[in-house]
From Swiss-Prot:
Segments of skewed composition (Polar residues): 270-280
Protein name from the UniProt record: Zinc finger and BTB domain-containing protein 38
Segments forming C2H2-type zinc fingers: 342-364, 371-395, 460-482, 488-510, 516-539, 1010-1032, 1038-1060, 1066-1088, 1094-1116, 1125-1147
Cross-link annotation Glycyl lysine isopeptide (Lys-Gly) (interchain with G-Cter in SUMO2), location: 43, 145, 148, 151, 259, 550, 557, 754, 758, 763, 804, 814, 821, 842, 850, 857, 923, 964, 969, 977, 981, 991, 1017, 1026, 1109, 1132, 1135, 1150, 1183
Effect of V1067I: Found in patients with pathologic myopia; uncertain significance
């Protein structure tokens, strides 16, 4: 008997929709997607099995093994990104959204190509002329439903400040390690609403809440977004009125641009359904009602929460509908759960899942408002292009169009008001977002970075470009690249940069500086890339080795490049002052307003001139300061350095010698003033019966200009706002900084002082034209100390009486000299253009203007201290001859300086203004002193300690430099004198050589006690002899581990191993062909240069290669003798080359005396080729070549 078991099949009608919605969620988030499809410039993440099940084209591609998809990336060339977005939405949601008739044609063509039958049949349907969009979807019965919606009214745009424009995705989760962007912003933000995004991210997750920004916020950060403003306009938010619970429709809706907050609890999301459905009553969080002038957009009438409200501690991540929802609809019974039906509040459409409803709600959103320039009414597709265009367009004469984009003017209200250049807006936080955060009591959003832990180290990653940084401050500084913040303006043009190194790299093209120096040839270049190409072409340096030969800790392997291949020189050109970003009328208006706020009776010096450099004449600026009254100086006890910002601007175009005299008489100098410091007005109090007093204050912005060298008070490098700079030593201003009295100088006395201390124009030009040695500078300063006029020591007390004081700074000052900066090419003191690097050096009471152009010796020497202390003695200037700049002492001491003496501008000392490449200090190699000592010993033996014939040619310089030193010179003084040429005592070769052989190295400095027993050749060490014996014995101890080839010399083995490594480091500079050995490269370069160093011994023909030359010579021999090979050392002729080689070995074993006799015979009589018709072989060069060939055979 058979018993039949009763079975019942249970079918889940919503299973297919649920699976499809989950797959769509995975596609949107980029999780578990195994294929990336590239269409135009957009990347799409998808599942290969879903695509293969929906399209015959993808099925053939993925199932067939004939087409190999590299890295699971497939590129479609014949489709548009917008069309493929609609196709993916149809595959994952079974819905097609049609907005235009052209979209239907494109979808039909794409469906025919991809093998999607539903899309092919779209062309057979009839569409009305209504502009509203159509929706086609497949129901459960297989019937296609069609829906048309009315076009919504346009809503004004809402902007929240500047956008971060960078073509990188910022939605990637922490667990995903894929190289491609998991979210296609261009495809997703158009079709997926914000409610769907926030709901899908926290769907059925009660243990963790991921941080997810809405698509509206994410769309701001990508170039792929076709319209950023649509994301703002397309996110309506409802605000229900608590007093009227029934009105949950269109009247009480307001749009708020709010950002969801991070949380640690699951997020409750809203599911729209019919208004008759019962919902739970969820109290909303307190949100301030902000008035936003926007039109209201429809929302679903009622909601049903699928997850209970969390009662645990912690913040709750609410969606935007939940935050603003306040409905008092009674809840359903606890025992009965109604079926989930999702109805649209705008139409009678019903859906089975929230995903389908969210895709449907995209149809009810308003269309995109066109982006129009407010100046020229030109339309653009992206906001980024519009912003760039408006920056250019606003500088022209176009007036803003009344109907233009008011959004741009609301965020950037200062653009175009003052007529200045655009410096870039600051990142603004909109008022609605500030109110939201302030009302909820939370802090400002901090989502500009992510924190990762790698090997126990915390790294901060940028959310835009995924770069990692060790410190948060470095990440904040890097964030300026992605924002509109531009805080580093160029000193020469109107460009503003986000980072200081960008500005430094840009200013090189203005100054023409060559800061990158090659360590091989010491040649300098403007950029690192030019330097790299130079080293690749001329020095055969392959910079790719520094990438492939990295060690574990990030450095280079010592075997590849043990040193850095360049050094970055410091900046030598002084930066020009900032150009004013405001017009003169606006700046004067601000200064006048600050003048009215100051105390009455204030004397203010203004700048009526512009900040640009005018045309100057150095010779016509002598009588300016002498005709003007002296400006007294007021110092404060708490201020070390009194500065003046506007006095030099009031003097106008005068500079040069007047500024120097101002330093001499009043200890008055000026500083370089930035644009921000012009707002500070300089004021002073007026007292009855006194002249107007100018009070000068040292603000905190000028702290970077103070650089302490030595002494009690810091030395100050202050820079003029236009041209010259003044360097004052610390002790020279000690009396001025320690005094609390007001210094008043008589105009008559100051005028007489200027006439007495005025330097002659030719002397100033001579100082500026050539560098001065240290001896000359110290001689000048010692003379200056002896001739200080007494009138310069008169100062005035507050009562007005003059009193004579002693200058303490002159008695106790330590004289130092600072090296000036080199001028730009083409500038001089006699031209009409002021040199940018002119610096006044304050030494004692005399100012010396000096320009020192570096470049001849870039590795500076360090001067030695003399054994005897130099005693300075004042000498009369008239009797002291002017030392010549070509003297050996001057040339020797002019370059003896330390690198610490070369300083940059005060603006270069900014800690944020780092160079583009790191700075490395290279210590030059020390020269060997062995040869120098031997030459000194031999010279002393021959000539004694002092030779009467070698007298000092410049006695005045030596007396000034050494002072009252003892008669016997120290060892350092003798070292500077030029030593005579020594003659070799071992041979007579140097006595008989002519002028052409003076550069040849000498070979008899050391003895050679080790001689070879076979060839009698002498060597200096036994190791060299042992290596030489391998030529006779045939020993080859060095074997290649790769191919087994043996070598007698280890250097030949190392050259051979390069062949197996495949390293071709030597590149031809003409054809960029790479070679393994440097010798091979040199031989190859002869093809390009045409150098033929091998010439025939019998004729005047020259050859590139040695083998070609030997073959040519053998032809001469065969033509002369008819047959056989001739020996070059004797008249014997051999029949074969092997016999000639055996014969030549006999000459190797003869005694040296016999070889000399045979050599004399060969040179005089025994050469058969010379005795006959070969006239060309009689030259001395050809005989030397024959001897060279014999020596090569011997070796």
């Amino acid at each position: 008997m058979t018993v039949m078991s009763l079975s019942r099949d249970l079918k889940d009608d919503f299973h297919s929709d649920t699976v499809l919605s989950i797959l769509n969620e995975q596609r949107i988030r980029g999780i578990l997607c195994d294929v990336t499809i590239i269409v135009e410039d957009t990347k799409f993440k998808a599942h290969s099995n879903v695509l293969a099940a929906s399209s015959l084209y993808f099925k053939n591609i993925f199932w067939s093994h004939t087409i190999c998809i590299s890295s699971h990336v497939l590129e479609l060339d014949d489709l548009k990104a917008e069309v493929f977005t609609e196709i993916l939405n149809y595959i994952y949601s079974s819905t097609v959204v049609v907005k235009r008739q052209e979209t239907v044609t494109d979808l039909a063509a794409a469906g025919k190509k991809l093998g999607i039958s539903f899309l092919e049949d779209l062309t057979d349907r009839n569409f009305s002329n209504s502009p509203g969009p159509y929706v086609f979807c497949i129901t459960e019965k297989g019937v296609v439903k069609e829906e048309k919606n009315e076009k919504r009214h346009e809503e004004p745009a809402i902007t929240n400040g500047p956008r971060i424009t960078n073509a990188f995705s910022i939605i990637e989760t922490e667990n995903s390690n894929n190289m491609f962007s998991p979210l296609d912003l261009r495809a997703s933000f158009k079709k997926v609403s914000d409610s769907m995004r926030t709901a899908s991210l926290c769907l059925e997750r009660t243990d963790v809440c991921h941080e997810a920004e809405p698509v509206r916020t994410l769309a701001e950060h990508s170039y792929a977004v076709s319209s950023v403003a649509e994301a703002y306009r397309s996110q309506p938010v409802r605000e229900h009125d608590g007093s009227s619970p029934g009105n949950t429709g269109k009247e009480n809706c307001e749009a708020l641009a709010a950002k969801p907050k991070t949380c640690r609890k699951p997020k409750t999301f809203s599911i729209p359904q019919d208004s008759d459905s019962a919902t739970e009553n969820i109290p909303p969080p307190p949100v301030s009602n902000l008035e936003v002038n926007q039109e209201r957009s429809p929302q679903p009438a009622a909601v049903l929460t699928r997850s209970k409200s969390p009662n645990n501690e912690g913040d709750v991540h609410f969606s935007r509908e939940d935050e603003n929802q306040s409905s008092d609809v009674p809840g359903p019974p606890a025992a009965e759960v109604p079926p989930l039906v999702y109805n649209c509040s705008c139409c009678s459409k019903a859906f089975d899942s929230s995903t389908l409803l969210s895709a449907h709600m995209q149809l009810h959103k308003p269309t995109q408002e066109p982006l129009v320039c407010k100046y020229c009414n030109k339309q653009f597709t992206t906001l980024n292009r519009l912003d760039r265009h408006e920056q250019i367009c606003m500088r022209s004469s176009h007036m803003p169009i009344p109907g233009g984009n008011q959004r741009f003017l609301e965020n950037y209200p200062t653009i175009g008001q003052n007529g200045g250049s655009f410096t870039g807006p600051e990142p603004l936080l909109s008022e609605n977002r500030i109110g939201e955060f302030s009302s909820t009591g939370s802090t400002l959003p901090d989502t500009d970075h992510m924190v990762k832990f790698v090997n126990g180290q915390m790294l901060y990653s940028c959310v835009v470009c995924k770069r990692s940084y060790v410190t948060l401050s470095s990440l904040r500084r890097h964030a300026n690249v992605h924002s509109w913040r531009r805080t580093y303006p160029c000193h020469y043009c109107n460009k503003v940069f986000a980072l200081a190194e960008y500005r430094t790299r840009h200013e090189i093209w203005h100054t023409g500086e060559r800061r990158y120096q090659c360590i091989f040839c010491l040649e300098t270049f403007m950029t690192y890339y030019i330097l790299k190409n130079h080293q690749k072409s001329f020095h055969a340096i392959d910079h790719r080795l520094s990438i492939s030969k990295k060690t574990a800790n990030g450095g280079l392997k010592p075997s590849v490049y043990p040193y850095k291949l360049y050094r970055l020189l410091p900046m030598k050109c002084k930066r020009a002052p900032y150009k004013s970003y405001r017009n003169s009328s606006y700046e004067n208006a601000r200064e006048n307003s600050q003048m009215n706020e100051s105390a009455p009776g204030t004397y203010v010096v203004q700048n009526p001139h512009s900040s640009e450099l005018p045309t100057l004449n150095f010779q016509d600026t002598v009588n300016t300061l002498t005709n003007s009254p002296a400006i007294p100086l007021e110092t404060s006890a708490c201020q070390d350095i009194p500065t003046s910002a506007n006095v030099q601007n009031a003097e106008g175009t005068k500079w040069g010698e007047e500024a120097l005299k101002m330093d001499l008489d009043n200890n008055f100098y000026s500083t370089e003033v930035s644009v921000s410091s012009t707002e500070n007005a300089v004021s002073s109090d007026l007292r009855a019966g006194d002249v107007p007093v100018l009070s000068l204050s040292n603000s905190s912005e000028n702290a970077a200009s103070v650089i302490s060298y030595s002494g009690s008070a810091p030395s100050v490098i202050v820079h003029s706002s236009q041209f010259s700079s003044v360097i004052m030593h610390s002790n020279a201003i000690a009396a001025m900084t320690s005094s609390n009295h007001r210094a008043f100088s008589d105009p008559a006395v100051s005028q007489s002082l200027k006439d007495d201390s005025k330097p002659e124009p030719d002397k100033v030009g001579r100082f500026a034209s050539r560098p001065k040695s240290i001896k000359e500078k110290k001689k000048t300063t010692s003379h200056t100390r002896g001739e200080i006029p007494e009138e310069s020591n008169y100062v005035a007390d507050p009562g007005g009486s003059l009193s004579k004081t002693t200058n303490i700074a002159e008695e106790t000052s330590k004289i130092e000299t600072y090296i000036a900066k080199p001028a730009l090419p083409g500038t001089s003191t006699n031209s009409n253009v002021a040199p940018l690097c002119q610096i006044t050096v304050k030494i004692g009471n005399e100012a010396i203007v000096k320009r020192h152009i570096l470049g001849s010796k870039l590795f500076y020497k360090r001067g030695r201290r003399p054994k005897y202390q130099m005693q300075e003695e004042p000498l009369p200037q008239g009797n002291d001859p002017e030392p010549s700049g070509d003297s050996p002492l001057g040339l020797c001491q002019s370059e003896c300086m330390e690198m610490s003496e070369v300083f940059d501008d005060a603006s270069d000392q900014d800690s944020t203004d780092k160079p583009w490449r790191p700075y490395y200090n290279y210590k030059p190699k020390k020269k060997s002193r062995q040869l120098k000592k031997m030459r000194k010993v031999n010279w002393r033996k021959e000539h004694g300690n002092r030779s009467p014939s070698h007298k000092c040619k410049y006695p005045a310089e030596l007396d000034c430099a050494v002072g009252k030193a003892p008669q016997d010179k120290p060892f350092e003084e003798e070292e500077t004198k030029e030593m005579p040429k020594l003659q070799c005592e071992l041979c007579d070769g140097d006595k008989a050589v002519g002028a052409g052989n003076q550069g040849r190295p000498h070979r008899h400095l050391t003895s050679r006690p080790y001689a070879c027993e076979l060839c009698a050749k002498q060597f200096q060490s036994p190791s060299t002899l042992k290596m030489h014996m391998r030529c006779h014995t045939g020993e080859k101890p060095y074997q290649c581990k790769t191919c087994g080839r043996c070598f007698s010399v280890q250097g030949n083995l190392q050259k051979h191993e390069r062949i197996h490594l495949g390293l071709k480091e030597f590149v031809c500079q003409y054809c960029n062909k790479a070679f393994t050995l440097n010798e091979t490269l040199k031989i190859h370069e002869r093809i390009h240069t045409g150098e033929k160093r091998y010439h025939c011994q019998f004729c005047f023909q020259r050859f590139l290669y040695l083998s070609t030359k030997r073959n040519h010579e053998q032809r001469h021999i065969r033509e002369h003798n008819g047959k056989g090979y001739a020996c070059f050392q004797c008249p014997k002729i051999c029949k074969t080359a092997a016999a000639l080689g055996m014969h030549q070995k006999k000459h190797l074993f003869k005694s040296p005396s016999q070889q000399e006799k045979i050599g004399d015979v060969c040179h005089e009589n025994s050469n058969p080729l010379e005795n006959q018709h070969f006239i060309g072989s009689e030259d001395n060069d050809q005989k030397d070549n024959i001897q060279t060939g014999v020596e090569n055979v011997v070796l």
